[in-house]
Amino acid sequence: MAATLGFRDLGLIDYETAWHAMKRFTDERGREAADEVWLVQHPPVFTQGQSGKAEHLLLPGNIPVVQVDRGGQVTYHGPGQLVAYLMLDVRRLGFGVRDLVTRIENTLIALLADYGVKAAAKADAPGVYVDGAKIASLGLRIRNGCSFHGLALNVDMDLEPFRRINPCGYAGLAMTQLSDQAGQIEFSEVSARLRAQLVKHLDYAEQATLTGGINHYD
């Protein structure tokens, strides 16, 4: 079991700022560096993964599109969505990539169960679904044995921009969110529950709250 998983709550932050910072963090970390999770929300943005195809961007309109280095296709981030960037030494943890993906999916399924929402993963389409509608997405990159990028859980947000794309490359894929499934919820409580479930499902002994921003990685 790993020792401590540190969490930084960064609030609303520009996508590209977070992306460049997580790449630099991963490139500069040493073998003894502690693992971190950055909890954020983003202003509206579409991100196109390495497998992304232009035809899945239907009508982006005035929402920016950023080509990124994670796996997967196009998705949307916006306020009211809880994003967790997972900077983990996967090699040290002893996880394979498929194992890591399964653990993240199980984390989200357990979190949703805390709210009485029955969710499931799909073997052929990474993410978490409620009655066939996608409630959480994930996309990772592994570099030098360490992960970055992570997961995005729709908590209480405007889902309309998802209709401007084929989410994750699937035409007509329905999207849902926790507030539609469980009623009124506190975003901060969801974040706290996600922290606890990540610690449990990634086999850490405890969690720690990290202070300070990420400007030195930007």
From Swiss-Prot:
UniProt keyword Acyltransferase present: yes
Protein EC: 2.3.1.181
Domain BPL/LPL catalytic, chain residue ranges per copy: 31-206
Main location: cytoplasm
Record key words, sorted: Acyltransferase, Cytoplasm, Transferase
Pathway: Protein modification; protein lipoylation via endogenous pathway; protein N(6)-(lipoyl)lysine from octanoyl-[acyl-carrier-protein]: step 1/2
Keyword rRNA-binding (UniProt): no
A GO CC term assigned to this protein in UniProt: cytoplasm
Binding site for substrate: R70, G71, G72, Q73, V74, T75, Y76, H77, S137, L138, G139, G150, L151, A152
Record-linked PROSITE patterns: BPL_LPL_CATALYTIC, LIPB
GO molecular-function terms, A-Z: lipoyl(octanoyl) transferase activity
Similarity-based family: Belongs to the LipB family.
The protein's role, per its UniProt record: Catalyzes the transfer of endogenously produced octanoic acid from octanoyl-acyl-carrier-protein onto the lipoyl domains of lipoate-dependent enzymes. Lipoyl-ACP can also act as a substrate although octanoyl-ACP is likely to be the physiological substrate.
Note: In the reaction, the free carboxyl group of octanoic acid is attached via an amide linkage to the epsilon-amino group of a specific lysine residue of lipoyl domains of lipoate-dependent enzymes.
Protein name per the record: Octanoyltransferase
Lineage: Bacteria, Pseudomonadati, Pseudomonadota, Gammaproteobacteria, Pseudomonadales
